[in-house]
Amino acid sequence: MKVTFEQLKAAFNRVLISRGVDSETANACAEMFARTTESGVYSHGVNRFPRFIQQLENGDIIPDAQPKRITSLGAIEQWDAQRSIGNLTAKKMMDRAIELAADHGIGLVALRNANHWMRGGSYGWQAAEKGYIGICWTNSIAVMPPWGAKECRIGTNPLIVAIPSTPITMVDMSMSMFSYGMLEVNRLAGRQLPVDGGFDDEGNLTKEPGVIEKNRRILPMGYWKGSGMSIVLDMIATLLSDGASVAEVTQDNSDEYGISQIFIAIEVDKLIDGPTRDAKLQRIMDYVTTAERADENQAIRLPGHEFTTLLAENRRNGITVDDSVWAKIQAL
């Protein structure tokens, strides 16, 4: 089905206010969920909203909490999210990293005691729109087996890198082949995954999203490489924030909350003039996209460039929402 941005935001806002969230916070949170969905990231927008409300009702998320600065070391700051609303706090933390970068050339904010930030790409994009390189990542509860194991002991720990090119170039990727959100999107659409995304119960690689959702044997991106990246990203976020690791979140908490996150902004214009920056970026993009195609009907893509098109299409034609997901939200 199709809905407008206004319908989507109003539905989110209604549910948040009915759960006791104050009107200003509810409006800002609803706006972010709706913008994420409008951008085409349904897995971490509309599809994730019922799960967000579940955690709000369980007390994992404290809606009136505000992040608090703990330590300041020039370009580096350490903050405690105090289990505040994840997407609103993440936006504030990237804003703070940008402020630090404006003074120092680079800014790094390490955040502990945080909640799920929904679409991580929003915060990299936020920096790139202002002309900064944006880098951020988060740890999570253990939802992926390390390479060679059957039991979940590491997080998908998504990493975002956004570059202020025209259009913005951005990688937004979990350390698994697919996020659990994208497994859900494909299952709801009745689709197999385009490539293997995990193991079935017999230990064979599979493209069936429902099987992987059930047995949790999701495949690390690049096999052992994604497994290793997940571990070191967790270590860095834990150390810099003095926060909880994947092990601590999984073993000590009843659900995924109290996680650790990193936000980095780099002011490129302190290092290179604007025309030179633009020319270098354009040469890179042109060199990549003019490579001989393996399939004449399939264009060579640059990461993140599709979001500009998706956003325009959703604004023109309405936002596609799965019927069952919309029914869940209406019932909240």
UniProtKB/Swiss-Prot annotation:
Subcellular location: Cytoplasm
Catalytic activity: 3-dehydro-L-gulonate + NAD(+) = 2,3-dioxo-L-gulonate + NADH + H(+); 3-dehydro-L-gulonate + NADP(+) = 2,3-dioxo-L-gulonate + NADPH + H(+)
HAMAP family: Diketo_gul_reduc
Chief subcellular location: cytoplasm
EC id: 1.1.1.130
Gene Ontology terms: cellular component: cytoplasm
Family: Belongs to the LDH2/MDH2 oxidoreductase family. DlgD subfamily.
Cytoplasm listed as a keyword: yes
Residues of the active site: 44 (proton donor)
GO MF annotations in UniProt: 3-dehydro-L-gulonate 2-dehydrogenase activity; NAD+ binding
Function field: Catalyzes the reduction of 2,3-diketo-L-gulonate in the presence of NADH, to form 3-keto-L-gulonate.
UniProt subunit comment: Homodimer.
Annotated keywords: Cytoplasm, NAD, Oxidoreductase
InterPro entries: Diketo_gul_Rdtase (IPR023689), Mal/L-sulf/L-lact_DH-like_ah (IPR043144), Mal/L-sulf/L-lact_DH-like_NADP (IPR043143), Mal/L-sulfo/L-lacto_DH-like_sf (IPR036111), Malate/L-lactate_DH-like (IPR003767)
Protein name as it appears in the record: 2,3-diketo-L-gulonate reductase
Organism domain of life: Bacteria
Binding locations of NAD(+): 168-174, 224-225, 304-306
